[in-house]
Amino acid sequence: MTDSARSNIPTFDGEEILAGIRRWVEIETPSHDGVAVNKLVDVVQSDLTRIGAHTVRTPGRDGYGDVLEARAPWGDENEPGILILGHLDTVHPIGALATTHVFRREGDIVFGPGIYDMKAGSYLACYALQHFVREGRRTTLPVRILYVPEEEVGSPTSRAAIEAAARKSKYVLVMEPARDGGKCVTARKGWGRFDMTITGRASHAGSRPQDGRSALRELARQLLDLEAISDPAVGVSVVVGMAQGGSAPNVVPALATATIDLRVPPGIDADAVVQRVLQRPAFDPDCRVEVSGGINRPA
């Protein structure tokens, strides 16, 4: 390699990067806690503004955090350029940092809530832009970074912003992590979400249990039947991620609900799988089963 070529290779400080990642990780950001997510949005916006990036912050709604867009301090903003996409929320609740997911380093591996998905990647986008400015470098195309606050629950409030930004871009780089062995992710499974409501009949558990129709018992049977749709061999998965029901310990439960997650890879008839989730005859004819939802993101 010539000296000229070597001089064009950027130099990065690994410890500086890790310190920045840790700073982001230690601000806990569960998707449904908009106030918590916005604490990190504040930090990111401040860091990007400091290097001259133009930031636009769109207030969140429905309890979610704000959407943050940052444009590099160069290039024509109207020219199709490079969009870097990341999310700032995680699946972990407040308190995970102090209990189940304490930040720690073991050799070359670092652990913490959301560090893999995807605070490390999101931070690297910010760091790269900072590094370009610090080194006096520019890309040929304009660069914008879009950080969303609720990707882990399907981007219900930021989807329109993502699609609009993507349409204006020539290239899109998503900062999600690689897979085992450093494999690059180039596609995603289709993703669907469904809500199930089961209505039974309440009765006193002590004096008249025979008069009741347990919505929870029906839910248990439905849960097993739903998850039997999963086929690991082809990559189809159906997971009942949340379930609840009942009103009191001494009452046969008249109501139960569940939230269902569906993943379908390319090449699979997603509509057929969706119908198997939606069409739910009751095991107990005295219970009513209702399912709503569908595919949120196609494969």
Task: Identify the role of each PLM range.
Residues 1-12, 29-30, 47, 59-61, ...:
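Metal-dependent amide/peptide-bond hydrolase catalytic core
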Residues 2-113, 134-139:
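Acidic/His- and Gly-rich active-site-bordering loop/insert found
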Residues 22, 45, 123-130, 159, ...:
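Predominant activation on well-ordered alpha-helical scaffold segments within soluble catalytic domains
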Residues 77, 106, 128-144, 226-235:
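Phosphate-handling active-site elements
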Residues 92, 109-123, 204:
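Glycine/serine-rich anion-binding loops at beta->alpha junctions
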Residues 118-189:
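Acidic/histidine-rich catalytic neighborhood of metal-dependent amide-processing enzymes
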